[in-house]
Each structure stands twice: as C-alpha cells, then as structure tokens.
Amino acid sequence: GATYTLPNSGTGTLYAQWQINTVTLAYDPQGGSGEPSDQTGDAASDVTVSSTVPTRDSYTFTGWDTVADGSGTDYSGGDTYTLPNSGTDTLYAQWTPIVALTYDPQGGSGEPGDQTGDAASDVTVSTTEPTRDGYTFLGWDTAADGSGTDYSGGATYTLPNSGTGTLYAQW
C-alpha cells in the first residue's frame, strides 16, 4: 500500500525483509507438578531438553515423549530437541506407577517397612520377622487366613500393576 517512486532510468529493486519465527517448546506434566518452564528460540534451532524433573504422587517420572501416550519420540533431560518451524511443540511427561508391598503383622509387632517399586517388578520379601507374645511366626501369606500364597524371607514377590500388595503374618 505504500507509494514507490520509480527511478528515472533503469530498474529499482525492493528487497524482502525477513524475521525468523520465535517458537516454543512446552512441557506437559500430565498430572504431575514442577514441570520446566517453556523454552523459546528461533524456528528450527536446537534447544537442550530441561533437566528439571516433575513429581507426581505414587509415580516415577521416566522421561518426556512427543506424544501423550508415550508412542512418539522419547527425550531425557540434556537431550537436544529441534524446535518447530512455527508454533509450539509439546513434550509430555511419562510416568510409571509406584506400587507397594506392605506387611500386616496381624497382632504382632516389629514388621518390616513397606517396599516400593515399579508396577509388576520383583522385590525380595524382607527377612525381618515380627514377634507376638505366645506365638511362633510361620511366615507370610497373601491372604489373612493363610489360604493364599505363602512367602518366606528372601523369596521373590512380584508387585501388583497398581496399588498395594499385602503379606499377612501367619502365627
């Protein structure tokens, strides 16, 4: 819309002026908190993925992914990420549930502390034995009445996929 005066002779040239896009890398904690701040930079430039680790109750942070369900490309803190040509890209926090094994002394005392781990991972049953006046400790069982699976100290126990597994003292 501006007026341009042609030269008296020859050719006049106008040159395009360009400014590179400023784009963003955002972090979605997917239910967690303490995610890194957004990072901005020039289009198609490289940035370093933040090493800030978000937290989420009962979950372990396993890294970032370009797709919310984890089916995209994985990134860890310190990795190089190439920003998009325009707009915003998002990295999504990936989580593994932390599950627990608890010990119910069923009237005894001195039971082992809870053990935590990743879903479906193996833990070693504690060798700590509770005590109960007038009773002999026989071991642990997955059912309070002893009708489940028996475990002794040092045995391998597979944690559940979610929640808490409990071993009950047998007297």
Task: Put a short name on every predicted segment.
Residues 1-171:
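Secondary-structure capping and domain/repeat boundary segments
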